[in-house]
Design a protein with these regions (language model features):
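Alpha-helical DNA-contacting segments of helix-turn-helix folds
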Residues: 32, 60, 65-74, 124, ...
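Key DNA-contact positions within bacterial/archaeal DNA-binding proteins
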Residues: 54
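Amphipathic alpha-helical linker/stalk segments
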Residues: 12, 30-34, 39-40, 68-96
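Short helix-capping/turn signature of helix-turn-helix
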Residues: 60, 113-118, 162
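Residues in the recognition helix of alpha-helical DNA-binding motifs
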Residues: 59-60, 185
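Basic, helix-initiating cap at the start of DNA-binding domains
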Residues: 1-48, 59, 65
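Amphipathic alpha-helical packing segments from all-alpha helical-bundle domains
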Residues: 95-109, 119-157, 163, 180-195
Length: 198
């Protein structure tokens, strides 16, 4: 009987530990959606997660370890959110992108502003840049014949600028455009670049 209970207790303990880690990461993530990294204390994260500062230090080392765990969460959430077939319409692809930006755009802009101060952000942001470029090239890259490699690269660069997180920030936050207006403007820019009528 004692042998049967031991695995149960170990698996229950492991599940509780995993649940605690998840609560801590999600608490830090919620705070990051609204605030700068340097403004958030481990005590705030601990209070939000229902644990102690010392437990966070034991599990994650310091704030950078916790930031790494949040980066893993952000990557995991972005994959399904951004997955659309390559052959969907410009509008459908941009609806997916803009929904993603609505979910995490402000946090990503804050991350970009803090990239030099927090080395833990660099891998995620570099991966994000690479994935955005690939996403743009796959969905909007020219099918026009006769473009040289240089012209194709320039076109992809223009399309990246049109769909970049900073373009969304300019339109949505700085100019106060609605989500629908941002979509309309981005669709028009992409279609014009591709030589299509909006």
């Amino acid at each position: 009987m004692a042998i049967a209970k031991r695995p149960y207790h170990q698996s229950a303990r492991a599940a509780a530990a995993e649940n605690l880690r998840k609560r801590i990461v999600e608490a830090f993530h919620r705070l990051l959606l609204k605030r700068w990294i340097d403004e958030i204390t481990l005590d705030e994260v601990a209070a939000s997660a229902g644990t102690t500062r010392q437990t966070i230090i034991r599990l994650f080392g310091a704030k950078d370890g916790l930031l790494d765990a949040v980066m893993d969460l952000v990557r995991a959430e972005a994959g399904p959110r951004m997955s659309t077939p390559a052959d969907v319409s410009v509008r459908a692809a941009l609806e997916t992108l803009i929904a993603h930006y609505e979910a995490v755009g402000d946090m990503v802009v804050r991350f970009l502003a803090q990239e030099e101060r927090h080395s833990a952000l660099r891998p995620l942001l570099a991966q994000g840049r690479d994935e955005h470029r690939a996403w743009v090239a796959e969905r909007f890259g020219s099918t026009q014949c006769g473009l040289s490699e240089l012209e194709r690269e320039r076109q992809i660069t223009r399309l990246i600028v049109a769909t970049d997180i900073y373009t969304r920030k300019l339109l949505r936050r700085d100019l106060g455009k609605s989500q629908d207006e941002v979509l309309h403007l981005m669709v028009a820019i992409i279609n014009k670049e591709k030589g299509e009528v909006t």
